[in-house]
Regions:
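Short, Arg/Lys-rich segments that mark the N-terminal edge of DNA/RNA- and chromatin-recognition modules
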Residues: 1-29
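DNA breakage-rejoining catalytic core of tyrosine-based enzymes
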Residues: 24, 100, 144-147, 158-177, ...
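Basic, Lys/Arg- and aromatic-enriched nucleic-acid-binding interface segment
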Residues: 121, 125, 140, 144-200, ...
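C-terminal catalytic core of tyrosine-transesterase DNA break-rejoin enzymes
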Residues: 140, 188-191, 195-202, 264, ...
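Conserved tyrosine-mediated DNA breakage-rejoining catalytic core shared by Y-recombinases
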Residues: 152-156, 165, 169-174, 196-241
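Catalytic-site neighborhood detector that most strongly recognizes the C-terminal catalytic loop/helix
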Residues: 166, 220-224, 234-236, 256, ...
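Active-site/catalytic core of tyrosine-dependent DNA strand-transfer enzymes
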Residues: 232-272
Length: 325
């Protein structure tokens, strides 16, 4: 039964205590509002339709992300990248909204603004996917009641046109020269990236003890599975020429430094629209041009599916024409 009483400041406070349900209370400007609220809540309880939304209404998106990062992100391979996305969400105007308050219209506003700013569709999709998983965890694992996933009602950005950028021999030569003037390790990093089609993170976490004869054994991969990458004669020569480090790592540079140095080298070499990840695309395409099968290429590059490989295998038209005769 609800108890309604007027407070000293003139507002009305309604309290509901019912066996089997949490105690609830709320303040209102008028007695009629308090009575209406009490009747609705008690009616839902009687019909077994009551949902306790207090946690959903009192927990902000930023607070939820703080818990998510502690309990979920920490176990992920990409925790560092996810931390940056979480930080951006938490600091935004959406971070101060409660989980119950954030609507699909808010996320549509975010989507359109980010695309207008020039963010890629994939970048926006990743940010929205993070919000979606936050709500999935909050509903399923944390048991926060009264929530629905706002991303499920949202139109996601269309996939960006997949990059098909391959450097010419002249461009690669110019970038290698410029990179050598920036940092001594950069030319080897660039060449080995092309020769092996390794991801940036895989290459930079490579340890000397994992370079074994004609193979490099990758203990830390994006997919979390151990992988052996065959080394070409050129790749092996480049690795052998690098000085041994006391810490056992093959390279000293951090991933973000390599990306920055690569962009600077491209700028100095007057090479436009070339990203470090394009080197993996180039290396993968070269493997196909050498006649390797999809399964063979996948075992080298670590791509899990044929559809993922298609993203990288834009074979040179001249080579295809040669095969046709």
């Amino acid at each position: 039964m609800a108890t309604i009483e007027q407070r000293a400041n003139g507002t009305w406070r309604a309290k509901i205590r019912k066996k089997g349900y949490p105690s609830l209370s709320a303040s209102f400007d008028t007695k009629a509002e308090a009575q209406r609220w009490s009747a609705e809540i008690e009616g839902d309880m009687s019909r077994k339709r009551f949902v306790d939304t207090r946690e959903a209404e009192s927990t902000t998106v930023a607070q939820a992300f703080e818990r998510y990062e502690r309990e979920v992100s920490a176990a992920k391979k990409g925790a560092r990248q996810e931390h940056a996305r979480i930080k951006t969400w938490s600091a935004s105007k959406y971070g101060s909204k409660s989980l119950a308050e954030l609507k699909s219209s808010d996320l549509a506003e975010y989507r359109d603004a980010r695309l207008k700013e020039g963010a890629s569709s994939n970048t926006v999709r990743l940010a929205l996917a993070l919000i979606s998983h936050l709500y999935t965890v909050a509903i399923k694992d944390w048991g926060i009641e009264g929530l629905s996933n706002p991303v499920m009602k949202l139109r996601m950005p269309k996939n960006s046109k997949e990059r098909d950028r391959r450097p010419s021999a002249a461009e690669l030569k110019a970038v290698l020269k410029a990179a050598g003037d920036i940092h001594a390790e950069m030319p080897a990093i660039i060449e080995i990236a092309v020769e092996t089609a390794m991801r940036r993170g895989e290459l930079l976490t490579l340890r000397r003890e994992n370079v074994k004869g004609k193979y490099a054994v990758l203990e830390e991969t994006k997919n979390g599975t151990r992988r052996s990458v065959p080394l070409s004669t050129r790749a092996r020569a480049l690795l052998d020429a690098l000085p041994a480090r006391i810490d056992g790592n093959v390279f000293s540079l951090a991933p973000h430094s390599v990306s920055q140095y690569f962009l600077r080298a491209c700028r100095d070499a007057k090479v436009t629209d070339l990203h470090f990840h394009d080197l993996r695309h180039e290396g993968t395409s070269r493997l196909f041009e050498k006649g390797l099968s999809i399964m063979e290429v996948g075992s080298i590059t670590g791509h899990k599916t044929l559809s993922m490989l298609k993203r990288y295998t834009h074979l040179c038209p001249d080579n295809l024409a040669d095969k046709l005769g």
